[in-house]
Amino acid sequence: MSHLLIQASTPLCLLQDAGRFGVRHLGVTQGGAADWLSMAWANWLLGNAPDAAVIEVTLGGLSVVAKADCTLALAGADLAATIDGQPLKPWRSFALKQGQTLAFTLPLSGARAYLAAPAGFVAPQVLGSCSTVAREQLGGPDGFGRGLVAGDELTYTGHAGQLRELSYELQPVFSANPALDVVLGAQMGAFSGQSTFDAFNSAWTLDTRADRMGIRLLGPALVYQGAPMISEGIPLGAIQVPPDGQPIVLLNDRQTIGGYPRLGALTPLALARLAQCLPGEGVHMRPITQDGAQREHVAFMQRLKSPSPRGRGD
């Protein structure tokens, strides 16, 4: 069993996996990695299951020390990672020798990086997951929902093989003003015609009021003209429109029910793109059919099963 010592951390450095399923009828949210795609690639680089437990590093501020020679993998945002001061780019596995320090400083591209270990980090399973949800006091290194703090030791039991790097053409690009695909919801027809036009033809800015529960989008006020709603279950990526007309995209740590009307829901791949956007950046929404969203998702999952890695001898 190998160990990593947390030397420094922030409240935004969390243990995550795919999240909790089959428990929302109990009022327990899903949790899980905000950018599931980058988590899956980080795990793939080590031959792990796609949902093996990883460290989600948001905006930087994490440093870890290897207690023994090890092989780890990094995917997602470029948070200016270094090993003993030497730059380390994402989308690759790498060796970390005993006593060396891996540090994440500040976002150069994207917002969230994912650090994987062979077979995944070991942590208590709470309702089938180790994902950290602070509000519900679930998951994390001790099972009670806290983030990583200095002095924590994380363990893993797997063994890595050859160092690998994800082919450039498969690496997600965290571009400016990304397109977010939306599967339209049941209340879409109850918005005004102007609001329907504005939703998909306007630039939206990410508000600073953003966390793992949701992200508010700033732009033209959308007007709902339908009858008041009874609260209902909320899927991951739902786009709620409160009375002020500014949409809120609900994320992994969202509440389980809500009564605001919804434009629809982001596709899983759109959610991964949104998770890498910073407050103040722009996005735009575009409608997609459920059929089209499913085809896009299946195509990605096929690439995940049989990508073209580059072996590395360094």
Cite the ranges covered by each PLM segment.
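Conserved "landmark" site that anchors the functional core of diverse proteins
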Residues: 1-310
